[in-house]
Amino acid sequence: MPNLQQTASQSQHHLYPPHLRPHHHHQQQQHHQQQQQQQHTHHQQQQQHHSDFPLPDGWDIAKDFDGKTYYIDHINKKTTWLDPRDCYTKPQTFEDCVGDELPMGWEESYDPNIGPYYINHLAQSTQLEDPRQEWKTVQEQMLSDYLSAAQDQLENKREMLDVKQQRLLWAQEEYNHLKLAASRSSLCSSSSSMSRHDPELLRADLMLARERVHQLKQELTHITNDISYTERGMNTLYSVGEKINARENGCYDIAEVQAIREEMLKVHKSLVSGEKVREELMRSLVQIKNELGRQQISEENSDLASPFDRVCVASQTDLCGSSGDNLNGGARFAEMAKTKLQYAEWRKHIKKLQQQLADHVERIEPGQLESDKDRILLIQEKEKLLNDLNSISLKSRSEEEKRVIHQTRHKLEEDLKEAYEANNTCVANRLRFHEEKQLLLDKLQEALKSTKLLEERLKSFSSESTFSISSGSSLGSLSTASSKSALSFTDIYIDPFAVDSPIDVVDLRRRSQRLFQQHQQQRLLPVHPVLQQQQSAEVTLSPRSSLSMETPPASPMKYNAGADQTPQALKEEPTYANALPAPPAYTAPPPVPISGVRARPYDLDSTVLDCMMLEAKLQKLNMGTPLNLAAAPLSPISEKPSLLDLPQEMLSRSSSTSNTRSVSAAVSNESVAGDSGVFEASRAHLPRKELAQVQIGLKYLKQEGVLVVSLERANNLLALWTASADNSQVYLRAALLPNSLTSIRTKALGDFQKPFFNDTFAVPITLDKLLTKSLQVTVVTMTGQKEEIIGTVQISMAEFNPEDSTLKWYNVLSSKFIPSFESLDIPSTSAAAAAAAVAASNAPSSGNNREESSDESTITSSQTSTLTRNQAPCMELQEQITAELLELGPLNEPECSDDDDEDEEEELDDKQLVSDVGLMNSSGMLDAYLQNMKQEFADKETNTDRAYLPEKSRGQSQLMDDRPVKRSQTFTPSAAVSKNRYNCRLNRSDSDSAMHCGVAPHTFQRGAAERRSLRFHTKAPKSVTKLHHTHIPRTSLDLELDLQAQHSKLYFLNDQIAKLQNLKEVLQKACENKDPLVAAWAIENEEFQRLVARADPAKCPEERQLQKLLMKTAKEIHKLRKTKVPKGCPDLVSFKEKITFFTRKGLSVPELPSEFTLPEANPIEEEEEEEDEDEFYNSPETAIAINTALVASSNRNKNLSEHPHRSTSGAVPKLPAPVATPAATPAATPAATPVATPAATPVVATAAQPEAKPAAAPIPVASNDAEQQRFDYVVDRNYGVEV
């Protein structure tokens, strides 16, 4: 091999050889001959490789120090990266390429930060675009078309500005007329006969005219800001198009792409820090607004309490007990199975709504809704101008003024008629699609709310404790300030603060059409003014209105249903099932809630609702008789009587308007809830008797290691006992479950109304074991030798505080609520018998080897005692929950994504969002529950000892390792069975139905090597199951748009921060000076209220979580829509969203008006000056100027309609100079900007070049002149280009 240094001494080493630049004559002839030879043997050469051909004479192969192969031409003493044999194996042009081939001289390479890029060795250049695709041309055409449409939209905004200015001129003229009349009336006030007008009416009209002028000035400012925003966005798009067209091939090389990427990351860091500053400023504004509200209220009436001072009593009581604790094991089992089934259905419903929204995005053009809104607003402005002209009195006008006004009216009527005809044909379909999208969004929001409620309910089940009131769990951070190496589409173009609350365009169009129809009717058939006023003053009272009821109802009950409700809604009981909107199982999605009737499950008693749900499910499964709700207990959390049985006259007085969950006083005066003083007073005259309760005291002695249980007294046990209490007695029995070998009992008493037991027991137990137990107290009656359990109380010791002693009243759950309760035929009532029953039920047993009670009694029918039968399913259930929750995925897990880093970040958010919440196999839970509840009805040929649990739950549960596997007697009893691999689930027969009934994750494969994998298929890792989408090509235009979008966001963020700082300073000064005008503006201004509502710390945590869920759902919808793009095809909708981002309205920060009111009219003013001013505003020249402006605006629109298409060939035309407006230059000063942002000009620095330091000034938009100074060009030997 020739020496590389010798060949490099006479040529440029590591550069492209000169024979790839202008060739010599003999080299051109040789190259031409090679082309002709290659055309004859093209088909054969495609099947050959480099190894099939030897290197030409004088050529050699070498490798660089980094392993890159290059070729040496010893004849010409040059080096090259090109293989000289490519002329035999590769096509010469793109037309000759087959499939994914690249022609000779092209190479595809990969950069870990940028991705794939392409090298043109012939032209010594690199580019980001794939040369085989024409996506760049399509993008340029789309950009040109959008700029043409945006120009029309801008013209509509400017025409709207002209109409608004005309309205302001007429309003100012009317105001000056009224001011002059009020001045003359004040001068002639000494004699009422000399006054032609009532002074009081003149002052009222003057006040209305002044407010109207002020309102029009504010609207004019908003339109001016909109125009300046749109103009800036269009100028940015024009500059992007010109910059791309100015390139030699319209592409950035790889070094420029790398520099742009680094610049985007720097700007993104500045955006993250700026957003934190903006949020802090908005929180400060919330505090200042609240302080101004307090000052205003204190000035008006110091005796009234401030509405901002609220006291939350949610954490002042020990809230314990819930429906889950009051229900025994079987009911709790079925209730959780049903809740998880609802949760699964809601997850499916959310996925379906997301898919429908992804489909709707393709039907609605991005930016088209904004254009339709501008058209409708323009029509509405012209209607208002026409109404203003119609309201002008013509009595004091000259003939010339009357003629101008009539011409202007006629012109406006013709324009409105043409606009309505055009809009009715082209806007109707788009608005229909938009209305459907809004309906889907509303359904999605309701679905997320319901799912969040179900998640909280599942958390209470999974923790084996009662419901608790908390401040809300952390959802994790959705900030994009992570250490990701690249920015995704959603990071740049989806921003929760980027867009204001949208205007309801559908309602706006309907209102505009209604005004037009009324105007047409008035022209055809004039209406008497008095009748017209009566028609407009009609008020429709809602059935939920406070005018038609004594007090607002607490919840939409069946008694106060209005006429607008459907018959189905009238028949529905206010149970938990219809209070919490849930989709029907495996059917269509839920219907839209009835307007005016909003479900509030917190207004109803949770225990009653849970039992009603259980009753409905049990009746559906034919598992028992209907439950008796006459003795429905009260939960310790909400000791409020159920509203189901209240009559109408009491229902209207027993409701609460508070937004918190009201808790009334307990039944007994010794109740903790009653003594706490934070509950509402108990309702005295209830149409039902009181419910059964027991008073239990608990205290733990740490030194002795003993739990002291005091069973003090009970109240109204007759509610549980329907038989005669003459010859019966009652006592209490308690045990610590599970695995308790001893139980305690009180003495038997004959008083069922208020028995006083006063028995204290000491149970030795360690503290760590105590916290894992639950205390179960049962109420047992004795009639002769027969005992019967009539109620039970279950207390979780997990929330017991060993440092303190408690004495509380607990509600007793009647045995009638659970069909599994049965009578106990026990001859003796000793405590040893009950302890033996507990021990027999919890001890391990297998086959016929079963421990039985050896005491005075045995349990009949080979069943466990009622105590342990009610408790064991609950413990097995908890173990199954713990195992299931570890293997289930989060809510709304994204199925596909192009950005792995974004997926990882959202996975962390999901895990924090729905921690300890999962989805169990509900059908398996119900099957297990059926086997527990109907154990005695099992087939006698099948020995069903105990309910079967899946293998994955048994593997993680230590308490159930020693229990036998449920088997059929038809299998060989002596066969050795290993629980770790024996996972056959038996049904009632020994046929193939005994196999696993789950749905296989793959199709059946006969003769598969691993047949056992078809039984229980483990969940594949996420990296395998995730659908990896094909690479969507990116172009230089995409990259430049992303960079300019980041700069635009930073520019407007700096502008918002400057305005917020200015607003904060003004409001602070007004708060210190107690300025009533500024305080009134801060409280009454709707725009300011919407701004501070975004960062109000008093907002409900659930609302914040819902907003984050909606934001996350928007990202998932974008991912779903990307998966619908065909393989290898560009995403047209995403590119349209990119270019519409620049003309989309951002977050508007209100500005304090310079003058809150116009100056009052001075009645002592000289009359001559007023007459001169009156002559100026009433002169016909002013009216003619207004008419001229209208005609000019109409001619401009006519020219635009005659030339709808503009020439877009060549360079993109420059936007004409914008109209000079006061808000054309946003007030973003460097001094008022606290965000430290990096320099706008990135430099590809060498090793010795220091990095650019951050500057305090905002990053300006990159200009065309700064492009030449962006890079220092050097020669890169790896890429072979100048960078």
UniProtKB/Swiss-Prot annotation:
Domain WW intervals: 53-86, 100-133
Limits of the C2 domain: 690-810
SMART domains to which the protein is assigned, alphabetical: C2 (SM00239), WW (SM00456)
MF annotations from Gene Ontology: kinase binding; molecular adaptor activity
Comp. bias intervals (Basic and acidic residues): 941-965
Subcellular locations according to the entry: Cytoplasm; Apical cell membrane
GO biological process: border follicle cell migration; negative regulation of glial cell proliferation; negative regulation of organ growth; positive regulation of apoptotic process; positive regulation of hippo signaling; R8 cell development; R8 cell fate specification; regulation of DNA-templated transcription
Protein purpose: Regulator of the Hippo/SWH (Sav/Wts/Hpo) signaling pathway, a signaling pathway that plays a pivotal role in organ size control and tumor suppression by restricting proliferation and promoting apoptosis. The core of this pathway is composed of a kinase cascade wherein Hippo (Hpo), in complex with its regulatory protein Salvador (Sav), phosphorylates and activates Warts (Wts) in complex with its regulatory protein Mats, which in turn phosphorylates and inactivates the Yorkie (Yki) oncoprotein. Kibra acts synergistically along with Ex and Mer to regulate the Hippo signaling pathway.
Entry protein name: Protein kibra
Organism field: Drosophila erecta (Fruit fly)
Lineage: Eukaryota, Metazoa, Ecdysozoa, Arthropoda, Hexapoda
